A protein has these predicted regions:
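Hydrophobic residues within membrane-embedded alpha-helical segments of Major Facilitator Superfamily
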Residues: 11, 18-21, 47-49, 136-138, ...
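Hydrophobic alpha-helical transmembrane segments of polytopic
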Residues: 8-18, 38, 45, 82-85, ...
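Solvent-exposed interhelical
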Residues: 134-161, 196-214
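Aromatic-anchored segments of alpha-helical transmembrane domains
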Residues: 17-24, 111-116, 158-172, 214-217
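Interfacial loop-to-helix transition and helix-capping segments at the boundaries
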Residues: 33-45, 118-132, 170-191, 217
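N-terminal membrane topogenic signal
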Residues: 1-14, 149-152
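Transmembrane alpha-helical segments and their boundary/interface "anchor" motifs
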Residues: 39-49, 58-93, 99-112, 134-136, ...
Length: 217
């Protein structure tokens, strides 16, 4: 069973690597075929979101936390390092020369930049992903209630499909605050939760079988 968790860790690391590589390559003038190939690094986003759902729900199954405890842990592991990076970036003179730098900093600290396209790309376009993952943290109780439904994964898929359809009909498919809203990736996150549930169930079955076999021996 440990090997499977190592696979999840590997997938997380590999997805981060592909995303970083994609942004790095697209910053330089490279041949068209390499540019097209680098775009596949975006698949790492989907893998990471699925792994996030898996890891968070497995942790919840092993040790349930209250909402306040959950947010505190996410604050220390994700939000605090994120804000430190933003503040350090703001101190670099040539990194951000915008006249609205203070507003941009505040938009990251108070998390309202995820709803304004003019602020979304401040301090690096790649920061959009942090906004999306934090949205999942903020609605964690809702995700638990949704997943506890008998067909929660299907509900999540339908919600994501409906959101994607609305975004397309509004002509906002290329607008980051629309196409990267958490509803777009809801089904992937919930699918990760489902896989964690299956993993936990199989672990308990294996442990039970080992107990029944080894105790008589």
């Amino acid at each position: 069973m440990l090997q499977r968790l190592e696979v999840i860790d590997f997938l997380r690391g590999f997805s981060i690597f592909t995303i970083v590589l994609m942004h790095l390559l697209q910053s330089y003038p490279i041949p068209p075929f390499l540019m097209a190939a680098s775009s596949f690094g975006g698949a790492g986003v989907h893998v990471f979101i699925l792994c996030s759902g898996f890891g968070l729900y497995l942790s919840y199954l092993n040790k349930p936390l209250t909402y306040s405890q959950f947010l505190k842990r996410r604050f220390l592991k994700v939000y605090l390092p994120y804000i430190i990076i933003i503040l350090v970036s703001a101190l670099i003179p040539f990194y951000n020369t915008s006249s609205d730098k203070l507003l941009q900093i505040l938009s990251h600290i108070f998390l309202f930049k995820m709803f304004f396209n003019d602020l979304e790309n401040s301090f690096g376009g790649q920061m959009w992903f942090v906004s999306t993952i934090i949205q999942f943290y903020l609605i964690w109780p809702f995700l638990l209630k949704l997943f506890n439904k008998s067909i929660g994964v299907i509900y999540a898929l339908l919600i994501s499909m409906l959101w994607a359809t609305i975004v397309a009909m509004l002509g906002k498919s290329d607008v980051r605050v629309w196409n990267s809203f958490f509803l777009q990736y809801l089904w992937e996150f919930v699918l990760g939760m489902y896989l964690a549930k299956c993993y936990k169930l199989n672990s308990e079955i294996v442990n039970l079988l080992n107990f029944k076999i080894l105790v008589p021996v």
